[in-house]
Every structure is written in C-alpha cells, then in structure tokens.
From Swiss-Prot:
Belongs to the argininosuccinate synthase family. Type 2 subfamily. L-aspartate binds at residues 131, 135-136. This is Argininosuccinate synthase. The keyword Nucleotide-binding applies. The lineage of its organism: Bacteria, Pseudomonadati, Pseudomonadota, Gammaproteobacteria, Enterobacterales. It is found in: Cytoplasm. InterPro entries: Arg_succ_synth_type2_subfam (IPR023437), Arginosuc_syn_C (IPR048268), Arginosuc_syn_N (IPR048267), Arginosuc_synth (IPR001518), Arginosuc_synth_CS (IPR018223), Arginosuc_synth_type_1_subfam (IPR023434), AS_cat/multimer_dom_body (IPR024074), AS_multimer_C_tail (IPR024073). Homotetramer. Its main location: cytoplasm. It catalyses: L-citrulline + L-aspartate + ATP = 2-(N(omega)-L-arginino)succinate + AMP + diphosphate + H(+).
Amino acid sequence: MTTILKHLPVGQRIGIAFSGGLDTSAALLWMRQKGAVPYAYTANLGQPDEEDYDAIPRRAMEYGAENARLIDCRKQLVAEGIAAIQCGAFHNTTGGLTYFNTTPLGRAVTGTMLVAAMKEDGVNIWGDGSTYKGNDIERFYRYGLLTNAELQIYKPWLDTDFIDELGGRHEMSEFMIACGFDYKMSVEKAYSTDSNMLGATHEAKDLEYLNSSVKIVNPIMGVKFWDESVKIPAEEVTVRFEQGHPVALNGKTFSDDVEMMLEANRIGGRHGLGMSDQIENRIIEAKSRGIYEAPGMALLHIAYERLLTGIHNEDTIEQYHAHGRQLGRLLYQGRWFDSQALMLRDSLQRWVASQITGEVTLELRRGNDYSILNTVSENLTYKPERLTMEKGDSVFSPDDRIGQLTMRNLDITDTREKLFGYAKTGLLSSSATSGVPQVENMENKGQ
C-alpha cells in the first residue's frame, strides 16, 4: 500500500492537524470543495501565543470539517519534557547555552496523540503543514506510522494541484475571502514562530541570515533582556526535586506538573532565561539556524544538573552527558520512542534521576546570567570536610598520598617510554627546552 499520497484522495476521510491559521484553514476548505471528507484535530500544547483553543474547532467546522476535536496534550508534553531533563537529552549547545529540544518534544506528543484520536474516528489518512525541507515531515511520518501501521500520508503542500491553485499566503487569503470568509492575513513578521508550553522556536525569513540577531525577535515567553530600557530586578528562586522529579518552586509544592511548568515559565520568563541562538544540523544534514526560548526548562535544567554534580561520581556524570547527547539527537530525529532511545531513557532515569533529591537556590538576573546561592540534598557526596585545607581530622594522611603518588610511577614510566617511541618514528620532535618530545610546530615545519 502506498504510504504517501501525492494527490487528494477524493471521497475519503482525511485527518488534518488543524492550527486555525491561514495555511490549514485554506487547506481544509480546499479539500472539502474538492470532494474529500476532512476531519480536524487540534493539539492543545499550551502554546503561549494561543488565546482561545475552544474557538479553533468551531472555525474548522465552519470551513467544512466533518468533525473537529480538541486534544489536550499538555500533561503528556510536560511529562516528556521532564523526562528529557532527567536524561539531559539535549545535543545542540553553543557557548554553553542549550537548545532544549522543545519542538521535537512537541512533535513526539502531537504525532502520537493526534493519530491515536484519528484512529478512534476511523480516519487513516493524515495531513499536516510540514514542508519537505524541514525536520517535522520526517518526525510526523515516523510517529504517525508508529501509532497506526495502516496510516497513509497526504500533505496538501506536496500536492501540485493544491500548490498550483493556492501556492502562497496571498492566494490562500484571497481564496478564503472569495468563499465568503473574511480571513485577513496576519501581519507578516520578519521570522516564523512555532511554540508549545515547553518553549518557542523562531526561525526562517530574516533569521536565515546570520547578520540578523536575537535583537529582531519579540519574545513570547520572556523579555528583551538585551534591551537596557527593560527593567529586570534580580530574583531569588528555589527549586526542589524528589527522585528526579521537580515538585516545588519557592516552597510551593505542585501536584500538577502542568501548573508547575507554567510557574517555572513565568519565573524564568521574567528574566529572559533559556533564550539561545543555535546553528544546527537538520535530519537531512543541511544546517539551519533558530532562536529559541525555554525559560521553565532552563530553570529546571540548571537546578537538576547542580544536584547531579553534587550527588553522582565522575564516571556516572560522564555517562549522563554522553548518553544524554546521544538521546537528544535521537529525539531531534523523531526517534524518541525507538528502542535505542527507550534503552537510554530507562538507564538514565533509573540510575541517575532516581537519586536527584534536594533543593537549589538561584539568583536570576538578565538573560542567562545567574548565580547558584545554595545547594541542599541528603544525597550529596560533596563533603567539604574531606578536603578541607584547615587543620583537623582527615580521612587520609600525607603518607597515604605519598603511597598513592608512588603507584602513579607505573603509568608515568609507560607514558614516557611511549613519547620517546613516537619521537623515534617521527610523530613527535625532540625539544631543546623540554625534557619530553613535543608535537612539532607546524610553522617551523613549513620553514
């Protein structure tokens, strides 16, 4: 059976991921007029720029949807976001600033929950607004087929008939007006924005050019921290984790993770925390650029990793970072529920996150400028008395350290012999100023 349909399947049910924007509105109306039976599905992901979710299904019905459903995905989205924090599932960083994979997390939830709802309604053809150059077309493809093995894909934006008739936003707006809907195009921004409760992505248009900076972006989850006219007073915040799970902010315990994430967003957003500018590799290996917001994720991540470094040993922390980066890449590629990802998630949550209990107090200032003021945990292996420089009882003596250093002679001797062996083969050069062979200076080599 053909998985991807290039032309409209007339007379058949088609589920469309309906945002209520111009593109999906025009596509839904066009499909109905051409003889398909569209069903509209809207994911409530807690988008910070969406004012009225209940109005979206009503609009879909007006445009010709056979049925329209609003699917509340917020609880699952936050659960996956917390899992990503527990696992450090983030692989894109620049200068120490992290992209928290908020769009990939949203796609994992949307792609599974909407297709599951479609399956309940007997809808086995799915359409969405992703383009053929982006990551989402592959993410939705994978998650959709994982959820429904009988699923077929129809995307109006890959249908030449649709493109010929409604190839641009102006044509779509004119089409809606001609059909009796007073649909005005929204004011065009200098970039495109996609968001959910975990974060916002700003990309494309002017942001494709690297001489356009974060300063052209109007944050939707935070403030313009780079604008000196914006007053941002310093603020102390305390985050508490229990067995890897964030449970309290500033002493207030949350039984609802959605409410906890909303409050974390409010706190971090007041400072512009978690905003970053990233050049990344898309799934197809072409580079793209995005400016991201994730105030709540950033706040929780900082506190989590502070506890992590005080609780776990060096080798465990090294594995956390290595496996987290690997898992982050799988998440980015739309493989969050693949077996290799589940294996990594299980080990990181079981053996790392389960021990993360305690409180971290921070002072937030402007943007990503903050200080850690205090760290408290019953699980800390950080024991200042072990290494104190003050006189007193010690867990080991000077003689113990002499013995430990003497044992190092074994590998130091081996290393010295290897260095001189490399020099004999020409890999290293002898140095008049050093007692050991050195890597040859390339400038001298060319003279």
